[in-house]
Structures are given as structure tokens and as C-alpha cells.
A protein has these predicted regions:
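Conserved Rossmann-like nucleotide-cofactor binding loop
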Residues: 13, 36, 198
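Central helical "cap/lid" subdomain
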Residues: 181-226
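Conserved FAD-binding subdomain of flavin-dependent enzymes
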Residues: 20-23, 33-86, 99
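Flavin (FAD/FMN) cofactor-binding and adjacent substrate-gating region
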Residues: 73, 77-161, 168-173
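N-terminal Rossmann-like FAD-binding beta1-loop-alpha1 element of flavoenzymes
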Residues: 3-29
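Short beta-strand/turn micro-motifs composed of small residues
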Residues: 9, 32, 92
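Conserved beta-strand-loop-beta-strand element in the redox core of flavoprotein oxidoreductases
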Residues: 165-186
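Short glycine-/acidic-enriched loop or helix-start segments at secondary-structure transitions
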Residues: 17, 40, 100-101, 172, ...
Length: 226
């Protein structure tokens, strides 16, 4: 089987790559064993503002310009809802934070995301003595549902193989880098690894000085909080 690309891994990065290759009429085959779960455990929250000190996320606006239409196309493709848009309310801890908020609202890269008002606390159960500020253009992507739907979709088309990728079975021609590579009877022009943190086990890239990062997701039970 001759194809343009072999893709290893199908999380958010792999899905984005597959969508781009499809638009460019390139052929591909994906290998995915679900051993890397970064996308599946991700909270899926997108927010272009660093709320600790009210600074813009690096290229946050530019990233949203690419990401939001991408997720919209996926929703249309599967007749599903993955992008759940919701504002963020930032609780102020002091008068100084309120003043810093207004200063941030005047910054060109933040003014479209920060509402230039102070809001009353609508929740009696939440302690917010110095009130709140509203961040717009934020939301949460249901990553687990999206990845599951996309894997089933590719598998149904015969474009996804659910098995671990064996690096030892990959044949490269070092003398002719532009020639086809081979893998278990498949021939491809290129291979792209979308393994996330799994790249640390990849013999071609495990020399890179990468360090995994972790976040925290706190689930609370508050039945009386509307």
C-alpha cells in the first residue's frame, strides 16, 4: 500500500494534521494504540488570558483564529457539539487587582477579551468580596468525545489501525532521504509522530530535552450552586 503519510498517534494534534492532509488531497494511514492519553484527560479549556497577572497568552488571539474554525468544521462534519463556549469570571482579591484589571482592558492584545466593567457576584455561595471581572472568547472543548468520534470515523474508512507502532519495523533510506520509507508492507513519503509525551520513548526524538507538564483539574460537588 502506497500512501503519502504515515501518522503515529491520533490526539488533537493528529486530528488537526489529518484534517489538513484531507484538504490537500493527501493520502495517509494512522496508527493509534491509545497508550498516550494526554488529549483524553485534558480539560479542554481555552483561554487567551493569563489570569494571574492579566497578561495575554503568547499568540493567543492568533491561535484562536485557527482553532475555533477548525472545531466548527469538526462539529459540522459529525453533526455534534464539541466547542462549548462559556465566559470566565475572575474573582478579584483586592482593590489593586481591580485597578490592574482596568489597566489590562486598555491593552490592545487584551481589550477584545476583557470586559471593562466590574461585575457583582451573582452566586451567594461564592466568596467574592471585591467582585469579579468577565473574560470573553473562552470555552471548553469536549476532547474525549471528539477524539473518540474521530477515531471511529477513520477506523470505519480503513484509515486507522489500532495497534502499537513498532519503531524497529520502520525502514528508512538514510542515503536517499526523499525516497519512500517502509513499514509493515506500507510505503510512504513521510512519517509524522503525533505522540505527545510519548515522544520520550521514540528512538528518533528521545534525545530532545523535553519535560512533561501537568495541570490540575478539581471537581467539586455543589448541588446548591446554580
Amino acid at each position: 500500500m502506497k500512501i503519502d503519510y504515515i501518522i503515529v498517534g491520533l490526539g488533537l494534534a493528529g486530528i488537526a494534521l489529518v484534517e489538513e492532509l484531507t484538504r490537500r488531497n493527501r493520502s495517509f494511514l494512522v496508527f493509534e494504540d491509545e497508550s498516550q492519553s494526554s488529549s483524553l484527560v485534558a480539560g479542554g479549556m481555552y483561554n487567551p488570558v493569563v489570569l494571574k497577572r492579566f497578561n495575554p497568552v503568547w499568540k493567543g488571539a492568533e491561535q484562536l483564529q485557527e482553532a475555533l474554525p477548525h472545531y466548527k468544521r469538526l462539529e459540522e462534519k459529525f453533526n455534534a457539539t464539541y466547542d462549548r463556549k462559556m465566559d470566565i469570571l475572575r474573582i478579584f482579591k483586592s482593590i489593586e487587582e481591580q485597578n490592574n484589571w482596568f489597566s489590562a482592558c486598555d491593552k490592545p492584545r487584551l481589550k477584545s477579551f476583557l470586559q471593562p466593567t466590574i461585575e457583582d457576584n451573582p452566586y451567594a455561595e461564592v466568596k467574592a468580596e471585591f467582585r469579579m471581572g468577565r473574560v470573553k472568547g473562552t470555552g471548553r472543548v469536549d476532547v474525549r468525545e471528539l477524539v473518540s468520534d474521530y477515531r471511529d470515523y477513520l477506523e470505519g474508512q480503513g484509515l486507522l489501525i489500532r495497534e502499537s507502532f513498532s519503531y524497529d519495523d520502520l525502514e528508512l533510506n538514510d542515503e536517499e532521504p526523499q525516497s519512500q520509507l517502509k513499514y509493515k508492507g506500507h510505503k510512504a513519503q513521510r512519517i509524522v509522530f503525533c505522540e505527545g509525551n510519548g515522544v520520550s520513548e521514540n528512538p528518533y526524538f528521545n534525545w530532545l530535552p523535553l519535560e512533561g507538564t501537568k495541570g490540575e483539574l478539581i471537581t467539586i460537588y455543589a448541588p446548591e450552586l446554580s
